[in-house]
Amino acid sequence: MAFYGVAKRIVQVVLWPFYKVEAEYRAELPQNKGYIMASNHVSDMDPVMLGLAFHKQLRFMAKEELFKIPVLGRIIRALGAFPVARGKGDQTAIQNAVKVVEDGGVLGIFPEGTRFKDGKLHRLKSGAVVVASKTGADLLPACIQYEKRRFLRKRVKVTFGIPIENSALGLTGQSKTELRAANKLLAQGIAGLLGVEVP
């Protein structure tokens, strides 16, 4: 955690000439339990911007290829990220995600599964609600929006919404029907912050 704080400060200094990150919190967030933050996905910079905006350490899943890059792999692992094999139903990554939440951490997930630059919210994959089902954790909808400008100090707005309590998700098990319904609630939360239609 100490390394994370130092690294976050260094990143803030390095990126200051290029990005102005603004955070908005729509509600008071849980302090003494783990939960899942789920956001739209626009850019490779999203984990960094969300990390700068958020008041606690975020533990992100990251594609496994990044961990094979010398130096970078060690840095992102030290910052608390862990690998996921995309498109393979990676059970080890799910287990790691569950452990983050059960240990009282905040898990960061991009449920769309990949980046989209069209300003819309796309169909969500089930990873976030699967972890919620396994842990009893709440879901925190979030969104990230980049100002469309080419010059220095691009404005980045990060909005953290109202947590969706686990009891409202209706997850008595892991049936496809329950997961779809819970995903719909999460999509509504993210889409509402973005001001777009629910996929």
Segment roles from a protein language model:
Residues 22-23, 58, 139, 198:
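Secondary-structure boundary/capping signal
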Residues 20-26, 45-47, 94-96, 126, ...:
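A generic local structural motif
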Residues 2, 92-199:
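Non-catalytic C-terminal accessory region of glycerolipid acyltransferases
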Residues 16-24, 88, 142:
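Short gly/ser/thr-rich secondary-structure transition/capping motifs
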Residues 3-9, 16, 29-88, 96:
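Catalytic core of membrane glycerolipid acyltransferases/transacylases, capturing the structured
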Residues 27, 41-42, 54, 64-66, ...:
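Short, flexible active-site-adjacent loop segments at beta-strand->alpha-helix junctions, enriched
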Residues 18-20, 57, 78, 104, ...:
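A generic structural signal for alpha->beta connector loops
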